[in-house]
Amino acid sequence: GIFQWSAPSNIALVKYWGKRDDLGHQIPANPSISFTLNNCKTITSVAFEKKVNQDNWSFDLLFEGQPKEEFKPKIQKFLERIAPFMPFLKDYHFTINTQNTFPHSSGIASSASGMAALAMNFMSIEKALNPEMTEEYFYQKASFLARLGSGSACRSVKGNLVVWGNQENIEGSSNLFGVPFSRKVHSVFENYQDTILLVDKGEKQVSSTVGHDLMHDHPFAARRFEQAHENIDQLIPIFENGDLEAFIKIVESEALTLHAMMMTSMPYFILMKPNTLQIINAIWKYRNETKTPVCFTLDAG
């Protein structure tokens, strides 16, 4: 058989940076909330056929139609992590064919959309085996599985505004999967546009995994994790009343805080480029002069 899913990338407004390795795989040290990026997506098909040898994993990986060996270890690791929750996967050989509508490893989270699309394909196989599965279970488990491939992928499964991580004031929020933000959202955010500027087209010098690990002994980590909770609390009424000035303050502060954490870790590193600062200053100048409520956020790369 064959299934195909597309999943969008997402951009966090309140950033996920730091993991609780003591609690298991891909458990966030703080909650995050993200906008879904509808036009930046990964389209993935998974063809599957029964195989004889069920002791090991068997899959071929095509990226934009061409074999891509260097992506295989990440998929292998993902399969190993989800195996306890999907034991039937070892019965099949998979041909995974994936493509993005945006550049890979350029600071737009292709691992988020990629793992979300893959998780939904695997859930479609499980649903074919268990047709009585509910839609709610399908998407919640897909988000749970996607998280095991890439933390932020759990925010790319379902919803326009998605929360991941335990947050007291947000019903149903969990460290294990993302949930659509269920509170009232002002119409100003319904058609909020996200323009992506690629400042530097090279791959980032420090992987997110390494960056997350550097939060373990970070001198400012504990305060940062508290701040993320506080910022999500503040965003709840902002989303309801459409206060763009307050929204901008939190979103820009979060972006700069994320990069401040990188600059103050040990070893320290800078993923911003000189042009990034030029763009930030140009946005501030334009906003000041025109009073247009435009703001920036930054990804981890």
What are these regions (language model features)?
Residues 3, 9, 31-33, 42, ...:
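Structural beta-strand/beta-sheet cores of well-ordered domains, especially the beta-sheet scaffolds
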Residues 7, 29, 40, 158, ...:
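A generic structural signal for well-ordered coil/turn residues at beta-strand boundaries
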Residues 294-301:
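Acyl-group transfer acyltransferase/transacylase scaffold of fatty acid/polyketide systems
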Residues 96, 104-156, 160-163:
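Long, hydrophobic, well-ordered secondary-structure blocks that form the structural core
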Residues 44, 247, 299:
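Residue-level signal for inorganic ion chemistry
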Residues 134-288, 292:
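ATP-dependent small-molecule kinase catalytic core of the GHMP/sugar-kinase superfamily
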Residues 1-106, 120-136:
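ATP-binding N-lobe of GHMP and related small-molecule kinases
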Residues 103-105, 265, 301:
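Active-site-proximal beta-alpha loop/turn segments in soluble metabolic enzymes
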